Amino acid sequence: MEKVQQTIRAPRGTELQTKGWVQEAALRMLMNNLDPEVAEKPEELVVYGGIGRAARNWESYQAIVDSLKTLESDETLLVQSGKPVAIFKSHEDAPRVLLANSNLVPKWANWDHFRELEKKGLMMYGQMTAGSWIYIGTQGILQGTYETFGEAARQHFGGSLKGTLTLTAGLGGMGGAQPLAVTMNGGVVIAIDVDKRSIDRRIEKRYCDMYTESLEEALAVANEYKEKKEPISIGLLGNAAEILPELVKRNITPDLVTDQTSAHDPLNGYIPVGYTLEEAAKLREEDPERYVQLSKESMTKHVEAMLAMQEKGAITFDYGNNIRQVAFDEGLKNAFDFPGFVPAFIRPLFCEGKGPFRWVALSGDPEDIYKTDEVILREFADNEHLCNWIRMARQQVEFQGLPSRICWLGYGERAKFGRIINEMVANGELSAPIVIGRDHLDCGSVASPNRETEAMKDGSDAVADWPILNALINSVNGASWVSVHHGGGVGMGYSLHAGMVIVADGTEAAAKRIERVLTSDPGMGVVRHVDAGYDLAVKTAKEKGVNIPMMK
């Protein structure tokens, strides 16, 4: 991949570079994904998650930018794995962009085949929000991480993580949310990363409190704060596959154990034991097969240590990076003895159509986001947990790139919020249109048997019709851009998922599109879980009037 040293930053304000606000939103969000404040390796078009890219190569990026600048408001741009391939006449209520990233026929859906295609310049890895142009930095996963640790606290520690120690690893774009999510819940956390730059970045953005290269220092500080029942996050430089076994050997057992290293990609995401970053990069280039094997062996040691900690009483869970599957394939037959985070903590939220709803101020003015915060605090005042989140986010979350906010809203709530935001743009309360989107990790938009759809009640974990239906209904209902991806989060062969973005530009046409899209999108989550037999989803569907023909 050619590296290009240029600083990309989304335009701010109300002056258009394009022929309409929906096209402008797509252009600004693509560029925002590659803002150095937001992206992990912008010079390689990598946004987050190992090699999750915003465009296939620099030539494709420029062609997408040029296409968006000339795209009419009754045309649709098609993007195939990060490359613009067609512009068709459509209509004003159609999506302005349709994206399909990293999709492979099942028999060929593996990293080896993907890499062959990538080498030939025929494909890119879009992760989830990298290739769909709605990544907002680490805040994008923060509330989900906060909710996960909060639910763990409710289930196991009396509602708070005060006086507990969490051990985790991986401080990239996704995992970087963990330190702040734990401290927001009152706990102490040691978060390991092999790359000093990742830890430095989290400290700079106030997601992590301190840095150390010493396990002894990390443990001493952790114990001190644990005893005081005060929160602190400690970024520890090192390799988790070395440090976790060492802690097991010393008979040190944290209260909570998880992991968010980029284990979904053994070649580009995980560093084997005994290698510096530089040595790993050299081996990756010279002998990728050996590198992958060493990575998998290290991951197996990593999972073995997590299992040992679980046996000693640690609440242990997989945080969606497919590390258990790798260890299982390497012969560790009890790798799945600890659960994934969705069945353990998040599924009840999915049953209510809740998920990581986000919005971005295209103006670039933080005041626009603060005004929308007030909407949440006013309109959803009865939801104290949600309001607490907004108040904490305001105080503790630093914006990356265009100002944005995330909060988990459910069926009915998303459409209500979208209507209000569109009215605020229309009457000038907000200085420019707002982009509304979400992660692909949502209630009705993903099939991922080792993560979002793990251990479904009816055994339908691998049924992939749902994300396709989600993308189809969002497209016909007028989402501004819609994406269908493969392999996000857990790697090639293990997931299919869809994303949507809708622009609130203050027009009456946008109001109608928002109402349709922000109803059907979370509605798919309710439908998915009703179909799988979840009582809470049935209750939600009946209370909210979701029309499901065969619901009992």
UniProtKB/Swiss-Prot annotation:
Q: Establish whether keyword Lyase is in the entry.
A: yes
Going by the UniProt record, its keywords in alphabetical order are: Cytoplasm, Histidine metabolism, Lyase, NAD
Quote the cofactor binding remark.
Binds 1 NAD(+) per subunit.
Q: Where in the cell is it found?
A: Cytoplasm
- Keyword Magnesium: yes or no? no
Any one Gene Ontology molecular-function term assigned to this protein's record: urocanate hydratase activity
Q: What is this protein called?
A: Urocanate hydratase
Native species of this protein?
A: Bacillus cereus (strain 03BB102)
